[in-house]
């Protein structure tokens, strides 16, 4: 059986960025990694209704900076910033260092695979037919400007006794083209028949040229030679 590589991991360092960006020695690495996991787990549970796509964590010296990518920043910030201040204190307590929380609004949630997958799972939990939920998500994503999308659901679909997998694709989804900007995410629907898994691939176009996940060093400026130019001679 053919297995598919994770579309984001294979593109790290080429056109994709890491969700955790920090350096640590051998003793601190495991502690920081576990701290990142706990922070993401807490935010996902606490902000389950805020349509969170992903969380980027940076660790400047003796502090932590968390950026929350969400389609509903108002729920994260709260009235006069009260909710985000509570989150900051809880994150600082979990990480053990002073915390800073930023929010980034996702303008087009139809092009975010995590939000699309969560939308499908919420419909499945409300007993919407899985084919209708899949086709509706595909149509909305293509209408928003995507070049291609693939949606896959697996489990006891429609309450069947034997689990199966069904998928629907529209447009192009080139998984092995490294310059292809493909986003991928998953979600789970907990129904009365069991768990139904949802996978979403979204192709947004090709990124041409060199795109690295770090700033390139500035080229040294060429010093102008003193003296008269040929025009002045």
Curated annotation (Swiss-Prot):
Belongs to the universal ribosomal protein uS3 family. Residues 39-107 form the KH type-2 domain. Part of the 30S ribosomal subunit. Forms a tight complex with proteins S10 and S14. GO terms for cellular component: cytosolic small ribosomal subunit. Gene3D superfamilies: 3.30.300.20, Ribosomal protein S3, C-terminal domain (3.30.1140.32). NCBIfam families: rpsC_bact. Disulfide bonds: none annotated. It comes from Hamiltonella defensa subsp. Acyrthosiphon pisum (strain 5AT). One of its GO terms (biological process) is translation. One of its GO terms (molecular function) is mRNA binding. Keywords: Ribonucleoprotein, Ribosomal protein, RNA-binding, rRNA-binding. This is Small ribosomal subunit protein uS3. Binds the lower part of the 30S subunit head. Binds mRNA in the 70S ribosome, positioning it for translation. InterPro entries: KH_dom, KH_dom-like_a/b, KH_dom_type_2, KH_sf_prok-type, Ribosomal_S3_C_sf, Ribosomal_uS3_bac-typ, Ribosomal_uS3_C, Ribosomal_uS3_CS.
């Amino acid at each position: 059986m053919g297995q598919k590589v994770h579309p984001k991991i294979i593109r790290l360092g080429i056109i994709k960025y890491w969700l955790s960006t920090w350096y640590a020695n051998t003793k601190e690495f495991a502690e920081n990694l576990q701290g990142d996991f706990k922070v993401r787990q807490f935010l996902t549970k606490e902000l389950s209704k805020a349509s969170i796509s992903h969380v980027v964590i940076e660790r400047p010296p003796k502090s932590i900076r968390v950026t929350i990518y969400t389609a509903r920043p108002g729920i994260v910030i709260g009235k006069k910033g009260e909710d985000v201040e509570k989150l900051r204190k809880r994150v600082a307590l979990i990480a053990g260092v002073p915390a800073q929380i930023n929010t980034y609004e996702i303008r087009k949630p139809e092009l975010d695979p995590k939000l699309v997958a969560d939308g499908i799972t919420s419909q499945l939990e409300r007993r919407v037919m899985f084919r209708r939920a899949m086709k509706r998500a595909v149509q909305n994503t293509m209408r928003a400007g995507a070049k291609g999308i693939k949606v896959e659901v697996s489990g006891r679909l429609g309450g069947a006794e034997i689990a199966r997998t069904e998928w629907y694709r529209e447009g192009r989804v080139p998984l092995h083209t490294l310059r292809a900007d493909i986003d991928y995410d998953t979600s789970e629907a907990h129904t009365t028949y069991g768990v139904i898994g949802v996978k979403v691939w979204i192709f947004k176009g090709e990124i041409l040229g060199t795109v690295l996940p770090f700033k390139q060093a500035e080229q040294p400026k060429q010093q102008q030679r003193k003296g008269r130019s040929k025009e002045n001679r």
